[in-house]
Each structure stands twice: as structure tokens, then as C-alpha cells.
């Protein structure tokens, strides 16, 4: 996808958030040997099927069958995603950003844009290789003896249009869920966006949607989106494994956001945004016959500043493909108003400031990224609710066939709404061989050290294989109880597809546990999706 939406944090009934997009490349550069910036005369699109049958390691019958069944991405989709056109001046930054935009469609396993000359005229050659996009879902994961399984179908490139459709049935120890989803990155226009999801749960229903035109590139000047939610569901609130605090939630929400960039280039931007939201959201104990009904309204405004930069790595979170790592310097500042006249009780009405930022230091084959964010609600000048969070990631590939990672993060909540508490089993940002809901609360920390060793980058032309010794330490707890921390040291086997549209890695981890958060044997096993840093 060509945009990213910042999470909308809601504390004590006040919604704080905004939608932004961060795409970039380096500064524009002239072609070697040219005294003036040349003009792009033509764009050549070369789109290959999933397998190149001329390659020595092409898996024979499987390769031929996959190529025959797969609907190749349409050339018009590729051209429509590019941020440059014939007749434009050559800009290396926009060309690099176009390459990232194609990767963000999540329909290709390989993307490369180069320049060439045809009869002395400058041409861009866009070479892509489709990934296998039709994925029957038969999944199984286990951590600390708690099992989750799923079955379904995901099509990430429906009829070669780069639109996705999802139908998945998922069973966890908590509930059964049937999910339907659809994403269209060119809805009604070249840069229009549509995203919709419906979840039919064994204990409720929930639907969400988003439509509009986001900041689809670094130099984009305008954005407008609208999103919403409708839900009638149970909210599970865990405290040391106990779910006696289960509540019912009913919600209907509609929001709009508009943005304008008074300064925007291929290297950075200054964006101003204005957003509003109308919401009905109520919570009540299970079995309530007369459900309460509340109506709220909020409005917010703010600013985003960014100097944008991406680093291209391989074998970081996947195998045999180029990955874009965001090493931008960004700052987000905003404030939301929730007046009594718009439905908030006197004890909850107020203002909600929010701020977040990222600093990064890249080097050849490595980087360090520091991120922090905070938001809250002030009523009568006194903090009523809020959230603070921060993370540091350091990664290095300076040793051959190794990715060394050090990651630390922490966060704290004040008076969160039901269901917004931390649950490290669901979010996968905690010790990885512990059972379901072992770490829940309003405080959390996590330290991870991992050395991802490459065994095979493209085994049999189908998958990458690696191993990773790891050390995890962290946990979650409530403010009125002692810190609940545990850890594990162990080894994981990592296997990921190399011909699929997404390179998500499956992880089989075995570890020796210590500290709190488990009972029984100190040895734990986890089979799940690999951690993405």
C-alpha cells in the first residue's frame, strides 16, 4: 500500500489521532555525463510471471503450474502506481519512491527500475516479478501450550488488479472469528484508496472502513480520507488470566481528515491537517438489558514535519527480496478538543494534546531508529487519561549472512477504555514462548536480542531458511500490582516464502523460560509468525 495510517488512540472517550503517509527517497541527482536534467521520453514495463522457467533452480512442474494458474499484474496497474510520467524531468528521488510504491502494493516479489537509452532518448525500464498471490490459509500456532488455528483464502492480486480479498476463519482460545476483507489501492482514481473489513465473531460483530485519497507520495500536496466503525461485541479484559471483567461494547463512529502541505518535495514535507469525528460508544456489563446511549463529537488539528529517507536491505524481515526500512526524521504534533457541548460529561470534557517523533541514524548495512509518542486528555488542566510509548531498534548486517538486532520498547497507559489494555500474546511484542494472556496490563516493557543467521536464501527456488538464537525479557502488569516480568533464551527456526507476494516468515521457537508468567516446565515452544522489527 502507498500510505500508512497512524493508530488512533482513544483515551477516556476522546479520540486522538491522524492519518499520515511517509514515502521518500534520496535527493534528486543528475545522470552521469549530463549537464542538464534530461526528460523521460518513454517508460518500458517488463512484468514477469511468478517463476522464470529458464532459471536452473525453477521447481519444474510446480513452476509451470503456478505460472499457468496465476493472473499476471496488468501493465496499467504498474504504470498507474509510478510517480513519474513520460515528459517529466528525470528525478532520481521520485524514481526511487516509485520503486518503493510498487513494492508497497504487495503483489511483487522483485521490483527494479533502471534507466536506458533508445535512439539517444531516455527511457525508464520498470522490471517486476509477480509473487504468488492466491494463498489458501491453513495456519497453526502455539505458545506455551495455547493453540490457535485458522483456515481460509487470501487473494492479494485479484485478476491482476492489485486489489485484495480475504476470507478467513480463525479459532483462538478466546473466540471464533470469520473475517472478510477487501483493499483497493486505486479506488475510482489513480491514487484513491478503499479498505473494508467485517468480522463475524462468536460473541459479536465488527466492521471498519476507510476511503479517500491519502498523501500518496512525499511531494503530495493534499489528502482527504474518511473512515468509520460499527460494532456490537464483547470486550475481553484480562487480569492475571481472569476474564471476570468482560463487558459489552456497542459503537458507531464516522471520521474525516483533510491535509494540506504548504511545503512538499521529494526529500521532505510540512503538512497541516484538520480532522473531526462523530461517535457513539458505550460499555456495559454482560447481560445488560437496557444499554446506555451516548453521543460524542471531537475536532482536532495539527502539523507533521518530515525529512524522509529509506534504506534498502535484504534478509531483514524476509528472504530473497528488497525491503524498505524507514529511517526518516519526523515530528507529529496535534491537539484535539472535546467540549461539553458535544456530549462529554464535565469530568471528561477537555483537550487532548498529542506528539510523536522519530530519529534515525543509518549506516552501510545497518541502522538505529528511536521512536517516541505521547497523548492524553486534560480536564480542568489535570491529566485524566493518556498513553506514552517509546522504542529503540538497532540492526546490523555488517557480518556476512547475519542480521544482529537489539530492540527495546516500553509503554504505559492511564485510565484506558476496556479492551485497550496491553496483551503481549496478541500484539507479539513480548517474550515469545509464553502462553496466552500471560502478560496483560497497563504497563509493558520488552527487550529482545536476536542474531538471524542465513542458511539458504532461496532453497529449491521456493523458500528461505534461517536460524536465530534469541534472548527475550519483558512483560506487562497493572499499575496497582508489582511488575510481572519474564524471559526466555532459546533458538528459532525461520522459514519464509521467496515467490509469494508477502515474505512473512514462520518461526518455530524453543526456549528456556525464567522469571514470572508461566507454570509447569521451564521449556516453552512457540509456532507463530516471525517478529517484524
Spell out what each predicted region is.
Residues 3, 31-155, 166-170, 175-184, ...:
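Periplasmic polypeptide-binding modules associated with outer-membrane biogenesis and secretion
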Residues 39, 122, 132-134, 147, ...:
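Outer-envelope beta-barrel architecture signal
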Residues 82, 113-115, 132-142, 149-172, ...:
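Transmembrane beta-strand segments that form the barrel wall of outer-membrane beta-barrel proteins
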Residues 82, 330-533:
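C-terminal transmembrane beta-barrel domains of outer membrane proteins
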Residues 149-158, 176-189, 207-219, 226, ...:
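Feature captures outer-membrane beta-barrel proteins of Gram-negative bacteria and organelles
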Residues 151, 177-183, 206-212, 224-227, ...:
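Outer-membrane beta-barrel translocator domains and adjoining extracellular loop/strand segments
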Residues 183-287:
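Transmembrane beta-barrel wall of Gram-negative outer-membrane proteins
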Amino acid at each position: 500500500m502507498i500510505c500508512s495510517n497512524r493508530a488512533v488512540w482513544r483515551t477516556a472517550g476522546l479520540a486522538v489521532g491522524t492519518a499520515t503517509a511517509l514515502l521518500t527517497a534520496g535527493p534528486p541527482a543528475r545522470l552521469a555525463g549530463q549537464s542538464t536534467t534530461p526528460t523521460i521520453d518513454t517508460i518500458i514495463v517488463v512484468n514477469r510471471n511468478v517463476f522464470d522457467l529458464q532459471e536452473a533452480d525453477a521447481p519444474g512442474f510446480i513452476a509451470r503450474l503456478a505460472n499457468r494458474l496465476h493472473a499476471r499484474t496488468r501493465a496499467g496497474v504498474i504504470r498507474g502506481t509510478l510517480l513519474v510520467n513520460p515528459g517529466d524531468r528525470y528525478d532520481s528521488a521520485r524514481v526511487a519512491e516509485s520503486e518503493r510504491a510498487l513494492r508497497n502494493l504487495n503483489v511483487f516479489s522483485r521490483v527494479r527500475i533502471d534507466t536506458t537509452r533508445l535512439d539517444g532518448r531516455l527511457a525508464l525500464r520498470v522490471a517486476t516479478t509477480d509473487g504468488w498471490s492466491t494463498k489458501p490459509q491453513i495456519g497453526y500456532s502455539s505458545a506455551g501450550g495455547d493453540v490457535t488455528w485458522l483456515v481460509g483464502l487470501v487473494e492479494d492480486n485479484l485478476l491482476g488488479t492489485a486489489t485484495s480479498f480475504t476470507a478467513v476463519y480463525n479459532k483462538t482460545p478466546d473466540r471464533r472469528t470469520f473475517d472478510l476483507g477487501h483493499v483497493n489501492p486505486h479506488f475510482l482514481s489513480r491514487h484513491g484508496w478503499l479498505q473494508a473489513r467485517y468480522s463475524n465473531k462468536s460473541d459479536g460483530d465488527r466492521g471498519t472502513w476507510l476511503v479517500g485519497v491519502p498523501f500518496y507520495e512525499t511531494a503530495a500536496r493534499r489528502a482527504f480520507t474518511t473512515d468509520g466503525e460499527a460494532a456490537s461485541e464483547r470486550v475481553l479484559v484480562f487480569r492475571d488470566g481472569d476474564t471476570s471483567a468482560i463487558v459489552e461494547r456497542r459503537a458507531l463512529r464516522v471520521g474525516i481528515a483533510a491535509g494540506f502541505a504548504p511545503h512538499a518535495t521529494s526529500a521532505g514535507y510540512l503538512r497541516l491537517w484538520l480532522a473531526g469525528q462523530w461517535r457513539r460508544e458505550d460499555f456495559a456489563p454482560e447481560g445488560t438489558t437496557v444499554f446506555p446511549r451516548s453521543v460524542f463529537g471531537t475536532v482536532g488539528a495539527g502539523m507533521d514535519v518530515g525529512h524522509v529517507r529509506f534504506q534498502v536491505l535484504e534478509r531483514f524481515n524476509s528472504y530473497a527480496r528488497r525491503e524498505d526500512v524507514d529511517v526518516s526524521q519526523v515530528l507529529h504534533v496535534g491537539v484535539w478538543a472535546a467540549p461539553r457541548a458535544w456530549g462529554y460529561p464535565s469530568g471528561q470534557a477537555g483537550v487532548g494534546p498529542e506528539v510523536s517523533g522519530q530519529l534515525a541514524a543509518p549506516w552501510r548495512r545497518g541502522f538505529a531508529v528511536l521512536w517516541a509518542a505521547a497523548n492524553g486528555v486534560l480536564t480542568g488542566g489535570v491529566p485524566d487519561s493518556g498513553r506514552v510509548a517509546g522504542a529503540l531498534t538497532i540492526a546490523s548486517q555488517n557480518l556476512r549472512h547475519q542480521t544482529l538486532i537489539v530492540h527495546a520498547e516500553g509503554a504505559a497507559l492511564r485510565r484506558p477504555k476496556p479492551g485497550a489494555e496491553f496483551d503481549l500474546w496478541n500484539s507479539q511484542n513480548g517474550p515469545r514462548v509464553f502462553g496466552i494472556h500471560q502478560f496483560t496490563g497497563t504497563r509493558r516493557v520488552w527487550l529482545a536480542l536476536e542474531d538471524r543467521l542465513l542458511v539458504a536464501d532461496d532453497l529449491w527456488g521456493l523458500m528461505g531458511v534461517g536460524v536465530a538464537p534469541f534472548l527475550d525479557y519483558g512483560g506487562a502488569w497493572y499499575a496497582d500490582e508489582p511488575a510481572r516480568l519474564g524471559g526466555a533464551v532459546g533458538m528459532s527456526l525461520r522459514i519464509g516464502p521467496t515467490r509469494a507476494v508477502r515474505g512473512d516468515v514462520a518461526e518455530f521457537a524453543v526456549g528456556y523460560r525464567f522469571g514470572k508468567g508461566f507454570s509447569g516446565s521451564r521449556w516453552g515452544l512457540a509456532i507463530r509468525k516471525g517478529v517484524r522489527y
